[in-house]
Amino acid sequence: MKGKIQICTLLIIVFSVNCYCQNENSLSSKDKIYGLSLIWKEVSYNFAFFNQIPDLNWDSCYQDFIPRVLESENDWDYYLELQKFMSLLQDGHTRVFTQVHLRNKYYGTSIKQLNTKLIEGKVIITRVLDDSLRIRGMKPGMEIVAINEMNPFIYAEQYVAPYVYASTPHDRQLQIFSQNLLSGRVAEPVRIEVKDFDGKVERYSIYREPWIMEEEMLTGKPLEFRVVAKNTGYLKINNFVGSNSIRSDFDSIYEKILLTDALIIDVRENMGGWTDISQYILKHFANKPFKTGKWRSPENIAAHRSWGSNIEWFESGEYEVAPFTDKVIYTRPIVLLADESTFSCAEDFCADFLTMKRGKIVGSKTAGSSGNPLMVKLPGEGVALICTKQDFFPDGREYVGFGIDPDIEVKPSIEDIFQNNDPVLQAAIKTILQ
């Protein structure tokens, strides 16, 4: 089994240990230079995806950011510059996080009030979670036509895109227009203009509040199960976090799964977790051993560098996962749902599922970001995460930086959002009952 630490695992560690208060302007010029230089150095030796950004001159970028970090007015602004610096690497598992106290004071999101997504070239409200917004008439399917009196696309490019970490264009789009679009300083509500279905525009002021996804992953429900059409089970896996609890939860659900005639597994909006959990679940659906992905990581051998050699790689061997021998294996048809919000360990789950040849994937291309981040402590109790590993299918095909293609592509339309339809699930039911 792969000894793999996914990004959300590291973030849970980060946010559980970095929680004390500190002076918000504590970093000296020496600290700021050191932090920037530490990132530059560790990335130079350990980052696994320079081959996917051949036009980036990392040394030149480092030089460009020296005056920028020195001119930062406080610790928060300094970390914003570091985030911009790291975003140049275009990798979803390579990023910078501030100390939690600063993040909670300065950074907030409206994700608990409403959710958004870019659909058919428009910024569409997909969920309305706040009662006061519902009372005022906001509904899923409506379009956001302005943010802080700006075109939403111009606003996103100026205030959101520079801080986004993404390995693929579709993951970048999701992070800009879904996960971070209305985020910003906690003390500053975001003003949006929303066009209803009759063309009328209503203005709203949306408050922001501190929110840490990783904390919610620990406290939220990782698994959901119900039976849909014609005794078809539907298993929603929200994350692969919480080793012992999620195993016991799955074991309880598995007794119900065994009673179904077919199964749909949904890993949409799954941000990842622990590989041993994802493979624990998959082993219940495997009646023979299956291979898991290969990986490689950059190596630095000083003598070889002195002889002028190019980058060298440590490459893993093949790994094979054996099915359970002491449990009843589920052998009935399975369909897997995935999309651009299927990230990290959830993508490895998809890759293993395809390798097992247990069924089709329905939905859209996955995020295209997985790997093993190195954690680097920074001045001011921040943390840099640097992806050190490239993952592949067992046959050598890449999916990091590309995403995993579905067998059947289905994407929700604006009309689907308005009607509260799930065309991906509907297509899966149709496929599995054929």
For every predicted segment, state its role.
Residues 1-24:
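Bacterial Sec-dependent N-terminal signal peptides
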Residues 8, 19-21, 61, 345, ...:
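Generic recognition of cysteine residues
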Residues 21-263, 267-296, 370, 374-377, ...:
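Flexible, low-complexity junctional segments that flank or bridge functional domains
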Residues 274-421, 426, 431:
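Conserved acidic, small-residue-rich alpha-beta core segments centered on
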